[in-house]
Amino acid sequence: MKMTTIKQTIMIVTDAWYPQVNGVVRTLSQTREELIRLGYDVFMLTPEGFNTIACPTYPEIRLSLLPASKVAHLIRTVSPDFLHIATEGPLGLAARNFATRNAVKFTTAYHTRFPEYIHSRTRIPLSVTYSFLRWFHKPSTALLAPTKTVFNDLSYQDIGNPALWPRGVDLHHFSPATRRKKNPKPIFIYVGRVAVEKNLSDFLDLELEGEKWVVGDGPALAHLKSKYDDVVFFGMKTRDELPAFYRQADVFVFPSKTDTFGLVLLEAMACGLPVAAFPVTGPIDVVGDSDGGVLDNDLAIACQKALKKPRGKVRAYAETFSWDNASRIFLSHLVPSQVPADYGVFDNPYKDNTSLPLKY
């Protein structure tokens, strides 16, 4: 008689999901693919199917309206073996509150320098948002941080129970391939969201011999286009289109000072493109003093030095980052959400007799 293996289910709750294009969505999407490959069922609880409004300062993000009842119903119906709350938005908040009320164990993550991001747009004091984060993540069994620097920052601020969850890069999709450089002058490129918190002016104000390219969209695009007529703006490009841009350029410039990681850094390096950035959270951990690029408080100096980095060594360094390894570390931090010692089968807060169409 053939035994049937019952797959375990992981529920990931996130306010950030497609059609958004950002590092959080790419991280969760890639992690989902890896977890499925490793034999798990993964249920993504996202804004899809909820009534939403646009986030005031980030319209691409859809904020779910009054989601608590539906979130509770979905958790009961899916009855996941593991619950991970990826974001602190309305869906994450609803899932957190349901879990704490029903003694359900869960993990959380820290993807964005939330206090600094909010402060840059609204001037809300950092102390207010840090207090919120302490409250939000306190009941989590582990708060997953992308780098050691972020881990240390969270520990210093006494936020949650930090644990490391690194990132990876698709080394097949992002690869050097054949480089067909059309421009004899150096090309300095930025790829990512075009918004105030990305600090793009520090890059675009530089006097560099060569061209400056910006690939991406966002609320600051129109303003930057009108201010910098010497910069080539390409707008949003798909994931399939990005490798060609990385291969064509000579230096990837990353002026942000608020990112926790910066997946685009790995994408660029995987294509053999050296990075120039400030020595801040994100680049410090991803690039550091490696062959992948140059960090300097003077971004122009970083750009000039990065030009001399051998592309083969840049690629070799990127090959040390693996999504398989990152996803296995993610798994190692998960805790069973249904603990028999906490409640019996008849009072399991997950169980619900109401049927509901589910999407995996």
Regions found by a protein language model. Give the residues of each.
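Conserved donor-binding/catalytic core segment of Leloir-type glycosyltransferases
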Residues: 180-213
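Short alpha-helical donor nucleotide-sugar binding micro-motif in glycosyltransferases
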Residues: 75, 137, 237, 244-249, ...
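Aromatic "clamp/platform" in nucleotide-sugar-dependent glycosyltransferases that forms part
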Residues: 257
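A charged, aromatic-enriched C-terminal amphipathic alpha-helix characteristic of glycosyltransferases
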Residues: 308-354
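Nucleotide-activated donor-binding/catalytic signature segment of Leloir-type glycosyltransferases, i.e.
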Residues: 222-240
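Acidic anion/phosphate-binding donor-loop and adjacent secondary structure
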Residues: 169-186, 222
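Short hydrophobic beta-strand element within catalytic cores of glycosyltransferases
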Residues: 274-277
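Donor nucleotide-sugar binding/catalytic pocket of nucleotide-sugar-dependent glycosyltransferases
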Residues: 131-177
